[in-house]
A protein has these predicted regions:
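Short, surface-exposed "cap/lid" segments of acyl-processing enzymes
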Residues: 1-25
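Short beta-to-alpha linker loops that shape the active-site pocket of alpha/beta-hydrolase fold enzymes
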Residues: 32-36
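Gly/Ser-rich "nucleophile elbow"/oxyanion-hole loop immediately N-terminal to the catalytic nucleophile
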Residues: 60-82, 99-100, 104
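Gly/Ala-rich beta-loop-alpha elbow adjacent to hydrolase catalytic centers
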Residues: 81-89
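Active-site signature of alpha/beta-hydrolase-fold catalytic machinery across serine-
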Residues: 91-95
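A conserved short beta-strand
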Residues: 101-114
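Accessory cap/linker subdomain of secreted extracellular hydrolases
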Residues: 115-202
């Protein structure tokens, strides 16, 4: 999700998943991640810890709401997500398994089509000369991780070449969609990277 309004709290198109699950008897909790919806600041895209805490906070709020509304829950927890949601699903599963097993009875987890190995196979895919179907992914991760880890780089120009070092940042203020980013990106995302970055992967 790139646009801060394209989230469950704004009844985005993905809410159909919540409606479907609710219609089949599940209580569905679809979180907005940090930096999206009403949450201030940049969105830490594919940042496992913040995705997991947002999801767990939403699960706790949902459980409390159900108690207030006298909705009985059976205690089973099912997790799923697609793309970034798949990454968030796996991060949430990991946090529950490692830290919150006594609070949540994790019954099943189905992460789908997510970038799970961000610093491994996903990073390698980004530095190849091959086209990538969602070029916006690379700059989104770079801006996001620069926000989460401020020592990563002092200026985006250290990582991204011109003209993209100038043209991309305004598109990551929460008001644009991935299509607008892809429109100015090369088919092979690695073309925007500084040679020094590419050399560090060789």
């Amino acid at each position: 999700i790139l646009n801060r309004d394209d989230v469950p709290s704004r009844l985005s198109g993905e809410m159909i998943v919540g409606y479907f699950l609710g219609g089949t008897g599940y209580v569905a909790a679809l979180p907005d991640y940090l930096g999206l919806g009403d949450s201030p600041g940049p969105h830490p895209y594919v940042h496992a810890a913040s995705e997991a805490t947002a999801s767990i906070d939403m699960m706790r709020a949902t459980r409390e709401f159900c108690a207030q509304q006298s909705v009985l829950l059976n205690g089973q927890v099912f997790l799923t997500g697609y793309s970034q949601g798949g990454h968030a699903c796996m991060a949430t599963h990991k946090m529950i398994q490692e830290q919150l097993g006594e609070e949540f009875n994790l019954t099943a987890s189905a992460p789908c089509s997510g970038p799970y190995d961000v610093s491994g196979s996903q990073a390698q895919a980004m530095v190849t000369p091959d086209p990538y179907p969602a070029p916006y992914y690379l700059p989104y991760v770079l801006f996001s991780y620069g926000y989460v880890y401020p020592d990563l780089y002092a200026d985006i120009g250290e990582v991204i070449q011109e003209p993209w070092a100038t043209s991309l940042p305004p598109l990551f203020q929460g008001n644009n969609g991935s299509g607008e980013v892809d429109a100015i990106m090369p088919a092979a995302p690695s073309e925007i990277l500084q040679d020094s970055v590419l050399q560090s992967f060789s």
